[in-house]
Amino acid sequence: TCALPIFAIKMPVFSFEKLRGAEISLGPEMKSTGECLGIAKNFNEALYKAFIGAGIQLPKYKRMIMTVKDSDKEESVGVAKRFEALGYTIYATRSTAKYLQDHGVNARRVNKISQESPNVMDLILGHKIDLVIDTPTQGRDKSRDGFLIRRNAIETGVHCLTSMDTANALALSLETANDQMTMIDIATVKNL
């Protein structure tokens, strides 16, 4: 019997960067290519470790892009405020930026792909962004801005989240991340 509380969070791992041209927003038919496990004495630390295990390592620049569908705008405010409190600069497309600004978030407006530079793609391709939060409106249409934003983010090594609950979980885990955490790659541990 274990007397200490232990939290374990299993997280799927997807290899979207290997699937050139594929939509990265998840549907019910999507299968993960692996999984990782974050184990810790509290939920937030286990969550952070699971994100690290899944390959999401932040921050580098503390700059992010948010472009969310209308039905996610209300929830996006809380997520944006969490990232803002963590020191992130938030760039957002016109309607998302306006909504965030109207609700107290210091979001910087950035042009859509089809508009003049600087635009969303300039930030992504210029390797000036750590994270993209883009919730799809229709998905799978390769001509739409959202698809191009998500695809280019993945192909240039920028982490891209497509749901507000995952974005909120990442912010929560980053709020509690610290240098005192012990990270162990179990693949390197002998005698397990």
Question: What spans do the regions from the language model cover?
Answer:
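ATP-dependent carboxylate/acyl-activation modules
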Residues: 3-161, 167-172, 179-180, 184-192
